[in-house]
């Protein structure tokens, strides 16, 4: 296991020739701290797995350190379904650390910041949380995927802290010399009961000036971040304003790609590009100051990144959103949500978007906010 600073990680990346799995918390770069974040996760944590299972097109490949792949496969077949005995009569009380009225007031203030030129776009988050509640992380993860299956999901454990993540967003992927980033900005609620209205929502999202302005700012930031370490002239936008379908929502996703020099170190890439453009804003330094000023809690692993590094130094990392952070020791959980704020933002609609993004998690927890229809 590894935990330490980014400079320490630089040596780990250079010296390791095996798989590594782990995370970078948002705080690891913004606060420059070595201590654990408020949610209990280390700022930076990576581990070398005992076994790696790769499933592609119905073909399972098993790589192991101390056991034969055959033994691991037979152990999987013999494994019984493990679940914790949780009291199903529990009542969960979910609260927000910023209530609706205060949220609207903060968005109005952020629009003033934008109007006077402090920034152009800022990602602002609120946190829903509950205390004294026990959950089974594995069952919760399976339930979350059933409601909201997404391509960058993960169930991740660091001591007694769990990340139950159904992320739709990729931060960075490196394959050989090519690196890509795929910022998401732009969300529309789907209507699966009415195909005509569902198609209309998709069309409105694709044509929305407000959503396009959010997206293009994230794209410009990603281009700037990648240009700091990619070969000169290699950074380009291969897709702009793509509309992708998910079970709950439509998302506007763009793809920025570039060519990295030989022997590029992941620590240098993280130093240049993290935190990601879609979870900060423009200009990045100023909006990170505003985030610290207006958000009520440090983000921790939320809006950080979880991923893996292959023995060939390729890697793939997500953006930690649409996630439950659960502390099994204190029996507390939280799930922050947010969105990009621009001058065109309407505070009431921004709040509705936050609730929409939280709805899948609230659904599996069996909770409805008393003053909102989800």
Residue ranges and their predicted role:
Residues 1-374:
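Extended alpha-helical targeting/anchoring segments
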């Amino acid at each position: 296991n590894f935990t330490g600073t980014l400079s320490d990680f630089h040596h780990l990346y250079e010296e390791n020739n095996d798989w590594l799995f782990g995370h970078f918390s948002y705080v690891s770069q913004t606060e420059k701290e070595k201590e654990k974040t408020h949610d209990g996760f280390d700022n930076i944590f990576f581990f070398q797995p005992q076994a790696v299972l790769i499933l592609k097109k119905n073909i399972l490949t098993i790589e192991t350190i101390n056991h034969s792949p055959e033994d691991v496969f037979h152990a999987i077949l013999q494994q019984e379904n493990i679940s914790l005995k949780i009291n199903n009569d529990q009542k969960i009380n979910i609260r927000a650390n910023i209530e609706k009225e205060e949220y609207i007031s903060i968005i109005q203030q952020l629009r003033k910041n934008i109007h006077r030129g402090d920034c152009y776009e800022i990602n602002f988050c609120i946190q829903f949380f509950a205390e004294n509640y026990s959950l089974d992380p594995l069952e919760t993860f399976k339930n979350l995927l059933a409601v909201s299956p997404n391509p960058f999901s993960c169930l991740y454990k660091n001591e007694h802290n769990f990340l139950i993540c159904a992320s739709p967003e990729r931060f960075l992927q490196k394959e050989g010399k090519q690196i890509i980033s795929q910022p998401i900005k732009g969300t529309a609620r789907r209507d699966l009961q009415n195909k005509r209205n569902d198609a209309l929502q998709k069309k409105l999202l694709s044509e929305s000036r407000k959503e396009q302005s959010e997206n293009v700012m994230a794209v410009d930031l990603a281009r700037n971040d990648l240009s700091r370490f990619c070969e000169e002239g290699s950074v380009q936008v291969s897709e702009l304003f793509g509309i992708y379908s998910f079970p709950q929502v439509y998302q506007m996703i763009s793809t920025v790609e570039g060519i990295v020099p030989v022997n590029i170190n992941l620590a240098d890439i993280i130093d240049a590009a993290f935190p990601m453009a879609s979870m900060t804003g423009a200009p990045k330094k100023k909006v990170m100051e505003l985030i610290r000023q207006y958000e009520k809690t440090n983000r921790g692993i939320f809006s950080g990144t979880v991923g893996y590094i292959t023995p060939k130094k390729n890697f793939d990392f997500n953006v930690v959103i649409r996630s439950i952070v659960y502390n099994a020791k204190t029996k507390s959980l939280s799930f922050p949500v947010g969105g990009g704020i621009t001058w065109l933002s309407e505070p009431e609609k921004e709040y509705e978007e936050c609730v929409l993004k939280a709805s899948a998690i609230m659904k599996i927890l069996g909770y409805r906010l008393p003053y909102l229809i989800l």
